[in-house]
A protein has these predicted regions:
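Acidic catalytic/metal-coordinating carboxylates
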Residues: 35, 61-64
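Conserved acidic carboxylate
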Residues: 8
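Short, flexible helix-to-coil linker/hinge segments that flank and couple to helix-turn-helix
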Residues: 88-94, 105-136
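Active-site residues of response regulator receiver
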Residues: 54, 82
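Acidic, metal-coordinating helix/loop segments flanking the phosphotransfer/catalytic sites
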Residues: 32-50
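Short amphipathic alpha-helix used as the core "switch/output" element in two-component signaling
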Residues: 63-75
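The feature encodes the CheY-like receiver
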Residues: 58
């Protein structure tokens, strides 16, 4: 069963994400952390198949974390979750190395998004079909 590291600074949102993944029966929640620093520490000593990253983290942004993961752990894909549905954030996330972007309004789409990314595809929330962005 693929294991997912959740990086989300809002504890209630992190709990909702973890519950969605657990209830799907398709994924194991390896850990839930609240900062980029905690995420990098977990990645150094825990095997995960995907990192689910909130774009707005304290101290180090989710986009910066995605770039760090891409550099240090290139075989582990990142999927960004965000309240922002603008091309600016999508483009920055994809350029940093994210393999997908999900708008928090589409949070229940997370299971589908994770599967697409684990299958090697790029996944974008349905809301993003209405905006223009640079494809990686």
């Amino acid at each position: 069963m693929p294991s997912i590291l959740i990086v989300e600074d809002h504890k209630i949102v992190a709990e909702v994400l973890a519950n969605i993944l657990r209830r799907s029966g398709q994924y194991e929640v390896a850990s839930v952390v609240h900062t980029a620093e905690e995420a990098l520490e977990r990645l150094s000593n825990q095997d995960v198949d995907l990192v689910l990253v909130d774009i707005s983290l304290p101290y180090t942004t989710g986009i910066e974390l995605v770039a760090m993961i891409r550099q240090k752990y290139p075989s582990i894909p990142s999927l960004v979750i965000s309240g922002h549905n603008t091309s600016l954030y999508v483009n920055r996330s994809l350029k940093a190395g994210a393999r997908g972007y999900i708008v928090k309004d589409d949070i229940h789409d997370i299971v589908t998004g994770i599967q697409h990314v684990l299958d090697g595809d790029i996944y974008l929330s349905n809301q993003l079909n209405k905006i223009k962005f640079d494809k990686p």
